[in-house]
Amino acid sequence: MKKLMFALAASAAMVSFAEDNAELEKVDTPIFWGFGNYGIYSGYQLYGSLLNNEPTLQGYVEGNINLPGGFGYVGLGLWSNSDLTNRRRSGGLGQMFNEWDPNVHVGYTFWFDDNKTWGLDWRSSVVWYYYPAQDYKEMHPATDTTWDFDHSFALLNPYLIPYVNIVREYRFDANLFQFGVKKPIQITDELSICPFVEFVARDKDYNWCFPTQFGGIETCGGLATLKVELDTTYQITEHFGLFAKVAYCSIIDHHMRNSCDDILASDDYGENKDFVWGGVGVTFNF
């Protein structure tokens, strides 16, 4: 059985934090705020695809400034990865802290009622991917941005929260759509859980983190992966807590599954069509 890994993925953190921040806004409106997490993972999972099936350390931190007049916020974020084995290091990606992904972002919540229980949370960001060992930098000349331009939306409400993340990847002129539903549940004042189901769809040119990037596999795009996940958070103090996460991920695109069977039996991207993934770590906010 695969090792379990529990981690707080940055994309899920951003979606869920919108609801937490809404509660803060009901009480007070701070000028500066932020959050972060750091954990150990059973592997490097992205969009329901496993890029490395051996343990990694990954973390994310961001700081934000609320704009005057209640017009949302702007901020900076930084995600990092450290492979704990030589599986990907041998490919020239370096040792500890072999990936750094900074972002700049802006966000706003459009509330539909005075009690701030129903609303549409919006966030847009530009994400750069940087690998220090390769001095890696891919720039799109028309925009001077690297790789991803993301737009995220979540329909906040007391029941079931649908969300979508739209990713524009400039290097290959490709698009990806991440969408699902989640249900935050407060068990006690300290303990909360959040089950969710998530799908990923992409056009035929968005392949870099999927098995179809290898071997010239023909693909028409469409639904790519499915993820069913349970996140658990235990708040120890006002600003510090612990998290655990476990997920079942499955590649549902038949082109990808065929590529795993045909040519990728020994490659990280292809040997795990269906897998369990998870992690544990710490969370903080300020």
Predicted features and spans:
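A broad structural signal for short, well-ordered beta-strand segments within beta-sheet-rich domains
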Residues: 32, 97, 119, 223-225, ...
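Short glycine/proline- and aromatic-enriched beta-strand/turn motifs that initiate or cap beta-hairpins
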Residues: 19-69, 73-88, 106, 277, ...
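Short helix-terminating capping/connector loops at secondary-structure junctions
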Residues: 29, 71-72, 117-119, 190-192
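Cleavable N-terminal export/targeting peptides
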Residues: 1-33, 114-116
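Outer-membrane beta-barrel transmembrane domain signature
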Residues: 42, 65-70, 82, 110-113, ...
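Outer-membrane pore/translocation modules
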Residues: 51, 78-180, 264-270
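Intrinsically disordered, low-complexity regions of eukaryotic proteins
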Residues: 2, 21-30, 64, 103, ...
